[in-house]
Amino acid sequence: MTERLLVIGGDAAGMSAASRAKRRRPSLDVVAFERGEHTSFAACGIPYVLGGDIASTEELVARSPAEHAEHGIDVKMRTEAIELDTAGARVKVRELDTGTERWEAYDRLMVGTGASPLRPPIDGIDAPNVHGVQHLDAVPPLLEEAERSSGTNVVLIGAGYIGVELAEAFAKRGANVTMLEAGDQAILRLPADLAEDLRAGIENIGVQLKTNESVQAIGSDHVSTSEGAYPADLVVLGLGVRPNTSLAEDAGMKLGPAGGIVTDDRQQTSIEGVYAAGDCCVARHRISGELAYVPLGTTANRQGRVAGTNLGGGDARFPGILGTAVLKLCGVEIGMTGLNLAEALDAGFDAVANTITSSTTAGYYPTSEQVRVTMVAERGTGRLLGCFIVGGAGSAKRIDTAATALWNEMTAEALAEVDLSYAPPFSPVWDPISIA
C-alpha cells in the first residue's frame, strides 16, 4: 500500500524534505500545503529586489508548483493547515480562496511552517504604511513604495541583519533613511569595535543610525521614540522573526528557545512520526552545546534534507549549527560564526578575544581595503569559539575558513598553521584569519 507524506509549508525546509523523501522513495505519495502564492523561494534575496539589483521576485523562485509536480510532488497552493490530529494521523486544511475545510490523512508528517516578522504591540504598527519583510507575497506593495521612495522619508525599525540590508536597498533608491535600534549598536552580536566600523559604513551612505531608542508609536507621517520623533512616509520592520509554531504547540510538540520546535538529530519532534525543520525549529549549537534559535536559510535547507532522508527511509543526522552568516552594506562586508565573547562566557568557557586590523589584499595592491577580525578562543586550550569580521570587499567569505576551524574544534595555533592561499589581489602573505 502506498504511504502518504504530508508536508506543511512550501518553502526551503518543507520542499527540501519533500524532494529528498520523494527521491529516496519514489513510491511515496507526497502532498505539500502552502498558504502563500509561491514555493521554494529565496527570501534572502528580497532586499536586493527592493534595491533594484534583481529585476523581479520571480527570479527568487527556485522551483514552481508545476516544476514540483513534474517531480511527483503535489503542492496545494493557498491551502493552510489549521489543526493537527497526531493521534488520528490527520491534518485539517483550509482552502483560502473558498473557505472550504477538510481533513487529510497521512502516514508521515513534515512540519516546515517557517517564521513571521516580529510585530511588537506598538501603537500604529498595523497602519497601511508599515511593512514586514519575510515572504514573497508581501513584496509587491513594498516594491511599489521602494520604486517611488526617492526623496521620501523611510524609517527602518531594527538594525539587525534585515535592517542593514534594507538600509542599503532604500539608500540606493534615493530615500532619506533612518534606522532605529533599541540596543547600543547595529548587529548586536558584533564586538563593539567592529560595530563602530559598521556604523561608519552605514553613515557613509547617508543613513542615520539612532541607537538606544525604543519605538513608542507609529503615526501617519512620523515615528515616535523614547528620544524624539522622525518623519516617516514609509516604515519597514526589521526586528527579526518568530517561529510559526502555534500548530505544533496545540498538537503537544515540545518547544524550546524562542518557542521553536525541539527535534532530535534526525529532525523528529517529540511526537513519533512527525518531523520538523527550518525557521520553525531550534537547533543544537556545536560550540555551546545548547539549543538555540538561529533562523537561517542554510540551516533550513540542511535540516530539510536530513528530515527528507529519514522520511524517505534513510538514516541521516543533523550535526548542529554555528550560526555562520554573512551580509553587506554597500562597501562594508560582515561575517560571523560561533560565539562572541559574552556568549562564550555565558556558556561557561574561560574565554578571551583578540582583534586585529589587516588588509583584504596585499597592502600595495590598488583594491586593498581594511579588514578587522575578532577571534574568540578558550584560554588555556586555545580552542576557537567564534570569529567576527568587518571590512571592505573580499572580507566576509573569509568567515568560512574560521567556520571550518570551529566545526572541527581547532585551536587558534592550528588555524594559524593552515596552508592558506596567497596572491596579491586576494590577500596579504599572512591572511587576516591567520593573524587573528
Go through the PLM ranges and name each one.
Residues 8, 104-114, 230-240, 304, ...:
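Short hydrophobic core segments
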Residues 263, 277-340, 427-435:
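A conserved FAD-binding loop/helix module that cradles the flavin
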